[in-house]
Amino acid sequence: MNEYVRMKASAMKKINDLTLSGEIVIFGSTYMSEFPIYELTNKCKLENAVYNRSIKGLIVKEAIEILDDCVVDIHPSKVFIALGEEDESDPNAASEYSRLISTIRQKLPEAMIYMIGLTNGGSFAEKFNKNMLSLCDNKNVKYIDLIKKSSSENALFKAQFKQLSCFFRTSPITMSDIFSLASL
């Protein structure tokens, strides 16, 4: 395993006792590790805690190895997975992803799983996203196809957050929630 990934996972494990169970975990690679999730969730005052357990450069195979430390030990009710962008050279990435989903289902049977499609385009992303889509049952495992382009990186983050925040909720959206999201 990559030493950087091992170090980051170890650091995350050390702070797991500061988390609340039954909340939301985002588990991803480079893109989500750089996503301003805390700034956007704080701005919208979401009712749930969101823990970003994304690690720059994380590949699916490594994600399986650190799953307990980064996700399972938190006991989330929802898990958002954004992996695959670093796996283009791994011919087994799709089967590893399937194994990751199965492991989460086994260890967290009550958790909802949301797979976030790759946003970088190209033939690998298209094929990988199709494989992810085939893992969905639309009950406990769902697929999210994020907006891929916008006028700026900030605008893109905001648009993607608006998409994701709909899945973060545990209660119906209110008018004040709508206005809060619209102001992003």
Positions of PLM-derived features:
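Serine-esterase "nucleophile elbow" of acetyl-processing enzymes
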Residues: M1-H75
